[in-house]
Amino acid sequence: MTTKIALLSDIHGNSPALQAVLNDMQNQECTQVFMLGDIINGVDPHGCIQLLHDWCETNHAELTCLKGNGEEYLLTPDRDQLPDQDKEWNVDIINLVQWWEDHLTHADIEWIQTFHNHLFWKDACLVHDSPIDRLMSESWHKPNIAPQYQEWFYHSRGILPDMQDEEWEKLWAFMDTQNFSLVFCGHTHIPFFREHAGKRIYNLGSAGAPLDGDPRPAWVLVTESPSTDLDIAIRRVEYDIRLIHDLIDQTPDYYDFKDPDFKEAYKNWLSTGVHWKAHLGH
């Protein structure tokens, strides 16, 4: 019996893009879904959660989720006690996370609390950013920061296609010591595949906000059959970008849009697959 599994990451509140990915998943008859985090950090956090739930229920698909940065921030306790409360960058993140929380239901937040930090599935390690960051978190913990605030003050580089050779060697060696031969990750919004000595890494890219110069949402299809190894393919889907632009225009209170230039840069990011910083006029 052949089983189709969908893996996706980094929706970033872009419900029109997510709907296009879900339509493609339905066409492929996926019956299991792994979501690797960053669902909520965008203009339609509740809408994206609702779409995922409804699609999986309608298609009788099992859904398993990991926390991304957005979910980690949301679940940070006692945010009013965070260090560096008065620093501008922190004020902005605190207010942005509060906006997400205000636009989620109690049931949404309870569900997010069930998300995993990382997951092992068959011969694979599933993470949001990097298996080293998830399985060796003590390596990046900052001194004088309370344990509950460590994730708030850490933003992984993730796994990028242009990493230096020594970074790749460290990652392959880590996979050897941990006895897994396959990694699925997200975080960088750049979909790609890398193989070395029987080990494979798939970055799922982003299902809502790509950063590889291609605005089409990305996801990964895994086909499992008894007679062959896992068949793994990165897929891209078309969607009407005007729909997310309209949603942005209908959400003027989104905290990041306090700067009108950022709002336009954000739209241009989603239209081009090029980071919003490249579109700012200042």
Stretch-by-stretch model annotation:
Residues E110-L160:
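Internal, conserved structured core segments that host functional sites
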Residues D54-W121, G158-F174, N179:
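Active-site neighborhood of divalent metal-dependent phosphoester bond hydrolases
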Residues L182, R194-H282:
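Acidic, His/Gly-rich catalytic cores of divalent-metal-dependent hydrolytic chemistry
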Residues S156-L211:
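A contiguous binding-surface segment within folded domains or other stable secondary-structure elements
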Residues L8-S9, V33-D38, T64-N69, V127, ...:
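Active-site neighborhood of phospho(di)ester-bond hydrolases with catalytic His/Asp-centered motifs
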Residues H12-A17, N41-D44, G70-L75, L119-F120, ...:
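Active-site environment of divalent metal-dependent phosphoester hydrolases
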Residues M1-W55:
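N-terminal active-site segment of His-dependent metallophosphoesterases
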Residues M1-A6, L119-C125, H196-R200, L230-D231:
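Beta-strand-turn-beta hairpins that frame and shape the catalytic cleft
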